[in-house]
Amino acid sequence: MFSSGAGDLFQLLRDGRPRTRSELVDETGLARTSVVNRLAALTAIGLVTPTGTAAASGGRPAARLMFDQASRVCIGIDLGATHGTVGVLNLSGDVLCQESRVIDIADGPTEILTWAVNTAERLLAASGRQQRDLLGIGVGVPGPVEHSTGRPIRPPIMPGWDGFDIPAFVRRRLIATVLVDNDVNLLALGERATQWPAVDDLLFIKVSTGIGAGIILGGVLQRGSRGSAGDIGHVQVPGTANDRDLEATASAPAIAAYLSRDGAVNIEPGDVTDRIRMGDLTAIAAAREAGRAIGEVTAMCVSVLNPSVVVIGGQLGVNVQEIIAGIREVVYRRSIPLANQHLNIVPARGGSDAGIRGAGLMVLDERLCAAAVDELIEQLD
């Protein structure tokens, strides 16, 4: 027997397929009166809407109802170390509009979040929406986060952010639920939803100013007890000088520092990709070696977690094939054979909006779950 709540009935409709009341009766096993009452409640809170009629063999055609994906919106905010994106999404997680700019996360939470909130308000207005249409706001930041509070926990590349109450700051102007997570976790959610929806076990590795991983196992994002699951950037890499950690060995700043070591040129982290594209043999070799270092840590993750897919994203992960080549070389050699037998290691394909998509999905998963929908109905009463 199907669960009795309206929120449970709504979960069936989230696939976007229109259904008649009779079809829902057959699908759920509920009495017709129960289905009618639950649909009325879902319609009252704006989540379900009529959409035409179904063909009938005789008598009056039956009305069809479906999930109203345009009834509300959510906001996704993706903050990296050097780049920020804000977007408005519908209830299916489709991006309606977005805006990006170069940022420096070290400028601190007040400056960065003020820009993000200003941009969100402007995009909300541009999409013809008001705050009452806002279901929630998802925020990604480049460091460990205590998900239950939305506060960063000793983030290594985010000076001034430790313990900062991000939800409270955002809610000063945007009155809605605010959820915060590590940016790589949200990239993992966005990449899986758009590129690998049938894959339940996925590891997303971001290689950029920092290095981190998002872990999805059994279709569920894994955050760990304190939000540090996937914080591989500070894992020591065997065989490096003084057993340096992964970020100090293979991140964009680490490669730039290596290329600038003799003082003849000063390479910035953002220039690394260009040097490789120009055919700089030293830069190419450094990128390949960085990929091997990342591969050492990834091989351990693959052996322990046994994902079906490893996605390599971030500024270097997507744009520098030598990084992925180095990762593949080591992972297939060093991880246990059973774990890598059918393993795919691929560049990210979700595009520049994967982070805000993931932020939106985080909001939708929490605010449109069965219990949350039932709560919305109770509030209406």
Sequence positions of predicted segments:
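Short, acidic, Ser/Thr-enriched surface-loop or helix-capping motifs
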Residues: 90, 147, 216
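Glycine-rich phosphate-binding loop and adjoining helix at the ATP-binding site
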Residues: 100-201, 322-333
